[in-house]
């Protein structure tokens, strides 16, 4: 059951930890005149990882905890001691939580208990001079700085995970129905918008169980934000089956049916393709039979289940109808474009070179940024290695092809260099 503080959207800033720096050190022992390099590697920075938790029902904590920061990795030490990796920051979220960048680029979602999703990856620790030693340079006098951890803003949405969604305009009897067929105890009254947030209930029938959600009532133009609007329309996307309640107290039940489906269509056209069970509620009222017959004539190709919650009429029939339809309707995980996949060993070699208005050649690219962040520019040997790495991946030749000449300025990240052939 959700609390009065049900929050289904939050905006947060994630900070993964930076990698620790490798260090320059040499073995200093008596009777060992040429001990060689002994600088340890830096530890990896902590990542920001979200974890699905079945007991969580709201994003309330994230609503007020705007900044999610993981720790930095520890620096390496002498005597070949590596710095410790930083612990990851684990954040518990409800099942059905979806993550986006601020420009709505899909990052991932969590659907299962204890499922994890790395949103911001911690920086890799820099190598010490012992790890950088090779046959060409057996005693390097430089080390690598740790990589920066990822840092950006995200939008988090909770889309309720329920098998069945109860739909209808305000006061059609959704809350009363879910309280009768499950153990949910929503607030029930006769005024519109009694339900201000989704209520979940579990229905058991012949050893089969399903989760049903009482969603806040819709009104015309809900897809434009009228009433509770889009705030809760998104929860319908997860449901496999929709139970559409129509009140026989309405002046025109058919008009209500058409209007609600129009709202679904205008919000997301795929919603009207979901399996629906049409329920004519409040059959105990005068003229209900006449209105039901008129509705059946206009919806001749649709089975309508008449229902009276006061008289408990057809409640069991509805439960079995939902069960049978669910057994024929498999759960389909929504597809998202641009899914973010982490390759922990990926350091793409692509780069771009552009000449700005000031005549400066600007070099950008993921691997170039990594080289830059790992280099200690106060260390002459480290700068020489930086130049060697740029030449190795073809940047020097690419600059020549772009027309760079001796003495021209080249900008890499926040550093300006003079081009030397």
From Swiss-Prot:
It comes from the Bacteria. InterPro entries: G_OBG (IPR031167), GTP-bd (IPR006073), GTP-bd_Obg/CgtA (IPR014100), GTP-bd_prot_GTP1/OBG_C_sf (IPR036346), GTP1-OBG_CS (IPR006074), GTP1_OBG_dom (IPR006169), GTP1_OBG_dom_sf (IPR036726), OBG_GTPase (IPR045086). GO terms for biological process: ribosome biogenesis. Mg(2+) binds at residues 175, 195. Residues 343-421 form the OCT domain. Residues 162-327 form the OBG-type G domain. Its main location: cytoplasm. SUPFAM superfamilies: Obg GTP-binding protein C-terminal domain, Obg GTP-binding protein N-terminal domain, P-loop containing nucleoside triphosphate hydrolases. Its EC number is 3.6.5.-. Gene3D superfamilies: GTP-binding protein OBG, C-terminal domain, GTP1/OBG domain, P-loop containing nucleotide triphosphate hydrolases. The keyword GTP-binding applies. An essential GTPase which binds GTP, GDP and possibly (p)ppGpp with moderate affinity, with high nucleotide exchange rates and a fairly low GTP hydrolysis rate. Plays a role in control of the cell cycle, stress response, ribosome biogenesis and in those bacteria that undergo differentiation, in morphogenesis control. NCBIfam families: Obg_CgtA, Obg_CgtA_exten, PRK12296.1, PRK12297.1, PRK12299.1, small_GTP. Monomer. This is GTPase Obg.
């Amino acid at each position: 059951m959700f609390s009065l503080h049900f929050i289904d959207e939050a905006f947060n800033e994630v900070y993964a930890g930076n990698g620790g720096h490798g260090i320059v050190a040499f073995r200093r022992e008596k009777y060992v005149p040429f001990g060689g390099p002994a600088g340890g590697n830096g530890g990896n920075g902590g990542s920001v990882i979200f974890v699905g938790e079945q007991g969580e029902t709201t994003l309330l904590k994230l609503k007020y905890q705007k900044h999610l920061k993981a720790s930095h990795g520890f620096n390496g030490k002498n005597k070949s001691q590596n710095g410790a990796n930083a612990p990851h920051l684990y954040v518990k979220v409800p099942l059905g939580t979806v993550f986006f960048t601020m420009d709505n680029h899909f990052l991932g979602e969590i659907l299962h208990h204890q499922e994890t999703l790395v949103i911001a990856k911690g920086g890799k620790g820099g190598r010490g001079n012992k790890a950088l030693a090779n046959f060409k340079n057996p005693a390097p006098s430089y080390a690598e700085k740790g990589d920066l951890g990822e840092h950006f803003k995200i939008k988090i949405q909770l889309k309720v995970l329920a098998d069945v969604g109860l739909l209808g305009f305000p006061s059609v009897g959704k809350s009363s129905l879910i309280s009768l067929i499950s153990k949910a105890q929503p607030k029930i009254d006769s005024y519109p918008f009694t339900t201000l947030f989704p209520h979940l209930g579990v229905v058991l029938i012949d050893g089969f169980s399903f989760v049903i959600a009482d969603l806040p009532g819709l009104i015309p133009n809900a897809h434009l934000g009228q009433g509770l609007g889009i705030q809760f329309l998104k929860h319908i996307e997860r449901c496999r089956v929709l139970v559409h309640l129509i009140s026989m107290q309405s002046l025109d039940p058919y008009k209500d049916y058409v209007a609600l489906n129009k709202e679904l269509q205008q919000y997301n056209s795929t919603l009207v393709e979901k399996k629906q069970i049409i329920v004519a509620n409040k059959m105990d009222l005068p003229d209900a039979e006449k209105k039901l017959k008129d509705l059946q004539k206009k919806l001749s190709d649709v089975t309508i289940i008449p229902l009276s919650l006061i008289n408990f009429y057809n409640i069991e029939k509805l439960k079995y109808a939902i069960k049978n339809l669910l057994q024929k309707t498999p759960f389909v995980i929504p597809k998202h474009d641009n899914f973010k996949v982490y390759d922990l060993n990926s350091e793409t070699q692509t780069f771009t070179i552009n000449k700005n208005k000031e005549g400066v050649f600007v070099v950008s690219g993921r691997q170039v940024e990594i080289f830059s962040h790992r280099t200690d520019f106060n260390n002459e040997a480290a700068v020489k290695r930086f130049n060697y790495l740029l030449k190795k991946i073809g940047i020097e030749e690419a600059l020549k092809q772009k027309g760079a000449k001796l003495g021209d300025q080249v900008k890499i990240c926040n550093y300006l260099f003079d081009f030397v052939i």
